[in-house]
């Protein structure tokens, strides 16, 4: 089973677009897009991971 991952190396960003491309985090929370998710990953010091693409 391949691990699903997102490259968050360019984050955090001060503002995210309103683009809707949901991702489900390991915290079982749906993030609206990669930017919102990656900002949360940075805030969590890397403890938050991607569960899967799409809504939780």
UniProtKB/Swiss-Prot annotation:
Cellular localization per UniProt: Secreted
Q: GO: which molecular function terms? A: serine-type endopeptidase inhibitor activity
Pfam families named among the record's database cross-references: Kazal_1 (PF00050)
State if Glycoprotein is listed as a keyword.
yes
Recorded GO cellular component terms are: extracellular space
Disulfide-linked positions? 8-38, 16-35, 24-56
Question: Where is the site labelled Reactive bond 3?
Answer: 18-19
Q: Which residues are glycosylated?
A: 45
Q: Which residues form the Kazal-like domain?
A: 6-56
Matching entries from InterPro entries are given as: Bifunctional_prot_inhibitor, Kazal_dom, Kazal_dom_sf, Prot_inh_Kazal-m
Q: Which UniProt keywords apply?
A: Disulfide bond, Glycoprotein, Protease inhibitor, Repeat, Secreted, Serine protease inhibitor
**Does the keyword Disulfide bond belong to this entry?**
yes
Domain remark in the UniProt entry = Avian ovomucoid consists of three homologous, tandem Kazal family inhibitory domains.
Supply the name of the protein: Ovomucoid
Q: Which organism is it from?
A: Afropavo congensis (Congo peafowl)
